[in-house]
């Protein structure tokens, strides 16, 4: 019986879940997704198949030994434990890759040299000669990774990164790596579309990487079949007969696959790109199978059966100014809407705002990395109900228009200086105190001002992402206050924000906060769909300053989310009235066994999914359910579902038309809490929060549970001026197993 070995497949960040599925299909066993790759077990044939057929992996490492290496001497001794003469001879060329994390040996060149010395000294002792070093295409490549002073030493079977298929010797500007291109196509559902006979079109094909990878997928061609070099060809354990058998099998599959290849077409305006594309297509053996020609993207038209339009357009970071690209995206979007209805589309871009110029609402989003550059893959169904009118240039929202008018008034002297200066002084004071606190504690999103001065009833929130954004909420004045005076005070306050915070007006967003009624919490304020990414607690979230009443991230629950992360490990987590799922991200990050996110709004549930995806959490263990939470609770109780951790943050009041009746948290808390507690496992925890002021907890509904008021504990420093912003309890179910 063939010997089973341990292997590790490295992969670009974000591709690990796809690689797990691919390895499973290639016969790997004991598959485990880890940081920067996937562990698996298999025979030598399994490893050869992965080297030949993996479309996603970078390198395949065969584990040789593991040992403690807290010092250079321990590393040297550990490397010498392996009998290197069993793997290669002294006449072979050698390269060593060394990496280190959380270890005493931090210098990678020093670590690599120590490994080389240990191997060379062993050969000198046994053979009287040593292998020579060759950095490019060595006969043998050794990989050593040190993590927490534990070394893993392996043989790099790939030799060179597997994304280098061999068909591309030149590329145009901003090239796309071949395994990333394959991931884009797999995420876009191209294998299924191709199986149905659908066409593949790339309107900005560049050097044809997406087109060629699409053909390899559709025709069942092994991506490693073009390569002449692998890291096992000079290895003493290499089974040449087995390798030749696998190559023959791959050739037979390719011949059969090419006979059913659907139409694949590419276009580009750049003559040089078309020449490169044709050369690459020739080297891939696909001449006559892929059609490319010079044409502007806006003039591309469908050919063949409806299929997939895939594109990796320029996005500013690589080929120029973002503003100049808006017409490119917009014209391309208009082409899709007019001529490609019924098709699917996939767009990979490093600029989220440019993607909205397409004018089609994406059904799904995935975060991928083009090298170190974070990108988003947007997947579209091209149908009229998904179309919207994108904004022109850098459009001005109603809030920004109001802000501009206020600032212009201040410049003309139409706003009394004393009004402005009073607010500005308080803002500067808060910036000194809270700004310093935020920097020291790694808090990038916080409330800077919260109606500190009664005359200026606004909240000013700071959001740090790729830029610094300021979100200003004007609290609606009571009926007893003269509207003219209220507006004058608002103007005096807001006019100073750009100057004091040194933030461009375009990065400041102004809203009026009113009481929510019925479906109000789900209704958009505008139609811009304008999102940004911010960070909190090491996690990343999409926020929207313009289209909804709230931004998608409740800042007052920062500590509450951290508490959830602390206690989530190995628990099944339920998030009720989940909003954008930020608590779910924290639970997943804390090691929850699974998460279930329930909300009535499709918009917010989709937002939650994008937040999970942004942080690398796939759909396998993270269920999202669109439902009236009260109705869903009834069903969950009947089905006797159980969770180890539940977060309950219901609305204060709701009479939405999508609900069977009105809901008042003070009035209806008893039945609600009883049902939620009944879903807890023995010893399980419920974190219950409400924003209702003067809320009184009915502890009779929690009989038998341990109840702890954590309102003060979960109140962040930046909300201490408003201690009743929320009330929060930690509720423990009785441990019936005692």
Curated annotation (Swiss-Prot):
An example Gene Ontology CC term for this record: cytoplasm
Domain THUMP: 46-157
Keywords attached to this entry: Cytoplasm, Methyltransferase, RNA-binding, rRNA processing, S-adenosyl-L-methionine, Transferase
CDD domains, alphabetized: AdoMet_MTases, THUMP_AdoMetMT
GO MF annotation terms: 23S rRNA (guanine(2445)-N(2))-methyltransferase activity; RNA binding; rRNA (guanine-N7-)-methyltransferase activity
EC number: 2.1.1.173, 2.1.1.264
Family matches, as InterPro entries: 23SrRNA_methyltr_KL (IPR017244), DNA_methylase_N6_adenine_CS (IPR002052), RlmKL-like_Mtase (IPR000241), RlmL_1st (IPR054170), SAM-dep_methyl-trfase (IPR019614), SAM-dependent_MTases_sf (IPR029063), THUMP_dom (IPR004114)
Pfam families: Methyltrans_SAM (PF10672), RlmL_1st (PF22020), THUMP (PF02926), UPF0020 (PF01170)
Keyword Secreted on entry: no
EC primary class: transferase
Catalyzed reactions per annotation: guanosine(2445) in 23S rRNA + S-adenosyl-L-methionine = N(2)-methylguanosine(2445) in 23S rRNA + S-adenosyl-L-homocysteine + H(+); guanosine(2069) in 23S rRNA + S-adenosyl-L-methionine = N(2)-methylguanosine(2069) in 23S rRNA + S-adenosyl-L-homocysteine + H(+)
Location(s) in or outside the cell: Cytoplasm
Main location: cytoplasm
Function description: Specifically methylates the guanine in position 2445 (m2G2445) and the guanine in position 2069 (m7G2069) of 23S rRNA.
Family: Belongs to the methyltransferase superfamily. RlmKL family.
Protein name: Ribosomal RNA large subunit methyltransferase K/L
């Amino acid at each position: 019986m063939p010997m089973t070995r341990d292997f590790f497949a490295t992969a670009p960040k974000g591709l690990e879940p796809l690689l797990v599925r691919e390895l499973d299909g290639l016969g790997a066993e004991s598959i485990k997704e880890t940081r920067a790759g996937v562990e698996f077990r298999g025979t030598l044939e399994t490893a050869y198949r992965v080297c030949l057929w993996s479309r996603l992996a970078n390198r395949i490492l065969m584990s040789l030994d593991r040992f403690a290496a807290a010092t250079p001497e321990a590393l040297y001794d550990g490397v010498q434990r392996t009998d290197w003469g069993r793997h290669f001879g002294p006449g072979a060329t050698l390269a060593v890759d060394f990496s280190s994390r959380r270890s005493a040996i931090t210098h990678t060149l020093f670590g690599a040299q120590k490994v080389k010395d240990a191997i060379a000294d062993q050969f000198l002792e046994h053979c009287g000669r040593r292998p020579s070093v060759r950095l490019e295409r060595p006969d043998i490549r050794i990989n050593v990774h040190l993590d927490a002073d534990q070394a893993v030493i392996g043989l790099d079977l790939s030799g060179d990164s597997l994304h280098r298929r061999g068909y591309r010797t030149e590329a145009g500007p901003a090239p796309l790596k071949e395994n990333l291109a394959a991931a884009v196509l797999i995420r876009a559902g191209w294998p299924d579309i191709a199986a149905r006979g659908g066409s593949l079109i790339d309107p900005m094909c560049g050097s044809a990487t997406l087109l060629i990878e699409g053909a390899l997928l559709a025709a069942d061609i092994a991506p490693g079949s073009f390569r002449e070099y692998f890291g096992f060809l000079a290895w003493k354990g290499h089974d040449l007969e087995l390798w030749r058998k696998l190559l023959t099998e791959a050739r037979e599959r390719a011949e059969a696959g090419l006979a059913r290849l659907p139409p694949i077409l590419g276009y580009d305006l750049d003559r040089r790109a078309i020449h490169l594309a044709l050369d690459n297509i020739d080297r891939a053996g696909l001449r006559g199978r892929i059609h490319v020609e010079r044409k502007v993207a806006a003039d591309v038209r469908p050919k063949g059966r409806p299929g997939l339009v895939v594109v990796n357009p320029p996005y500013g970071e690589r080929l120029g100014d973002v503003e100049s690209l808006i017409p490119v995206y917009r014209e391309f979007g208009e082409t899709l809407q007019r001529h490609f209805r019924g098709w699917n589309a996939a767009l990979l871009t490093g600029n989220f705002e440019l993607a909205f110029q397409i004018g089609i609402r994406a059904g799904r989003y995935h975060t991928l990395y083009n090298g170190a550059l974070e990108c988003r893959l947007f997947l579209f169904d091209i149908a009229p109900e998904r179309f919207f009118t994108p904004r022109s240039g850098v459009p001005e929202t109603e809030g920004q228009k109001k802000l501009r008018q206020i600032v212009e008034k201040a410049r003309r002297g139409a706003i009394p200086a004393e009004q402005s200066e009073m607010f500005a002084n308080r803002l500067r004071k808060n910036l000194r105190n809270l700004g310093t606190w935020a920097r020291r504690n790694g808090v990038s999103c916080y409330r800077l001002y919260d109606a500190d001065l009664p005359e200026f009833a606004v909240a000013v929130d700071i959001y740090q992402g790729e830029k610094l954004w300021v979100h200003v909420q004007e609290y609606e004045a009571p009926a007893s206050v003269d509207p003219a005076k209220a507006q004058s005070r608002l103007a005096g306050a807001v006019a100073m924000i750009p100057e004091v915070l040194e933030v461009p007006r375009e990065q400041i967003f102004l809203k009026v906060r009113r009481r929510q009624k019925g479906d109000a919490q789900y209704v958009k304020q505008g139609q811009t769909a304008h999102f940004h990414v911010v960070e909190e607690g090491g996690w990343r979230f999409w926020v929207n300053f313009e289209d909804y009443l709230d931004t998608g991230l409740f800042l007052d629950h920062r500590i509450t989310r951290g508490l959830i992360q602390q206690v989530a490990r190995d628990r099944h987590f339920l998030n009720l009235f989940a909003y954008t799922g930020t608590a779910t991200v924290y639970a997943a990050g804390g090691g929850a066994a699974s998460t279930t996110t329930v909300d009535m709004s499709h918009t917010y549930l989709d937002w939650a999914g994008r937040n999970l995806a942004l942080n690398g959490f796939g759909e396998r263990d993270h269920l999202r359910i669109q439902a009236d939470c009260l109705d869903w609770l009834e069903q969950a109780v009947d089905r006797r579902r159980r969770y180890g951790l539940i977060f309950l943050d219901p609305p204060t009041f709701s009479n939405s038309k999508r609900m069977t009746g009105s809901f008042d948290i003070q009035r209806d808390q008893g039945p609600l809490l009883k049902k939620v507690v009944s879903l807890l496992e023995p010893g399980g925890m419920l974190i219950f929060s409400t924003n209702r002021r003067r809320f009184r907890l009915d502890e009779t509904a929690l009989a038998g549970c341990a109840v702890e008021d954590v309102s003060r504990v979960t109140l962040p420093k930046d909300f201490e001026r408003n201690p009743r912003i929320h009330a929060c309890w930690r509720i423990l179910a009785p441990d019936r197993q005692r």
